UniProtKB/Swiss-Prot annotation:
PANTHER family: ATP-DEPENDENT CLP PROTEASE PROTEOLYTIC SUBUNIT, CHLOROPLASTIC ATP-DEPENDENT CLP PROTEASE PROTEOLYTIC SUBUNIT 1
Pfam family, one: CLP_protease
Originating organism: Chlorella vulgaris
Enzymatic class: hydrolase
Gene Ontology molecular-function annotations: ATP-dependent peptidase activity; ATPase binding; serine-type endopeptidase activity
Keywords from the named record: Chloroplast, Hydrolase, Plastid, Protease, Serine protease
Family: Belongs to the peptidase S14 family.
Subunit text: Component of the chloroplastic Clp protease core complex.
InterPro entries registered for this protein in UniProt: ClpP, ClpP/crotonase-like_dom_sf, ClpP/TepA, ClpP_His_AS, ClpP_Ser_AS
Official protein name in the record: ATP-dependent Clp protease proteolytic subunit
Length: 201
């Protein structure tokens, strides 16, 4: 049985008493965003709108995007990536479970030094997919667009990771799963978060 979105108390500045707001709205006020489902037009527009609003409100404060997503629409992923790099606020991306497909693209798109994977998270990269139906000319046009997008995504992965374009293209040919540590070595993230409760150091 679904429990819905939990409500938490929050007192607005200047208000005498707290009011109950849903958890996500409360966290938005702390500049914390979530990509925790398949990325589609609605979610992409919501993330972009929140980023633009928070950037306009306070450019000197960073944003935090927590990611646990199977990916989703390529064009939506590119739109979110572009918005992250358009705003002035620093963007920290944090993988808290799985960042697959376009979710790994967004993870890699965080500001340098601020791309984090939790110790047991996993990251997957692969080539953009496209499914075409219709007349031959339409199928050809669609396949050309998919190839153009694949080159674009590969080039951005290469820039963000420091890997050569040829290696990125080769790695994108099939689903490539990486542990948090492997993702750091590859350059998709800058750090693996430390397990503070059980660390012996």
């Amino acid at each position: 049985m679904p429990i819905g979105v939990p409500k938490v108390p929050f007192r607005l500045p200047g208000e005498p008493s707290a009011q109950w707001v849903d958890l996500y709205n409360r966290l938005y006020r702390e500049r914390v965003l979530f990509l925790c489902q398949e990325l589609d037009d609605e979610l992409a527009n919501q993330l972009i709108g929140i980023m633009l609003y928070l950037n306009a409100e306070e450019q000197n404060k960073g944003l935090y995007i927590y990611i646990n997503s199977p990916g989703g629409s390529v064009t939506c992923g590119i739109a979110v990536y572009d918005a992250m790099n358009y705003i002035k606020s620093e963007v920290t991306t944090i993988c808290v479970g799985t960042a697959a497909s376009m979710a790994s693209f967004i993870l890699a798109g965080g500001d340098r030094g601020k791309r984090i994977a939790l110790p047991h998270s996993r990251i997957m990269v692969h080539q953009p997919e496209g499914g075409s139906q219709g007349q031959a000319s339409e199928v050809l046009s669609e396949s050309q667009e998919v190839m153009r997008i694949r080159r674009q995504v590969g080039r951005i992965y290469s820039e963000r990771t420091g890997q050569t374009l040829s290696r990125v293209s080769r790695d994108m040919d099939r689903d490539q799963f990486l542990s948090a540590r492997e993702a750091k070595e590859y350059g998709l993230v800058d750090q693996v978060a430390v397990d503070t409760k059980w660390s012996t150091n």
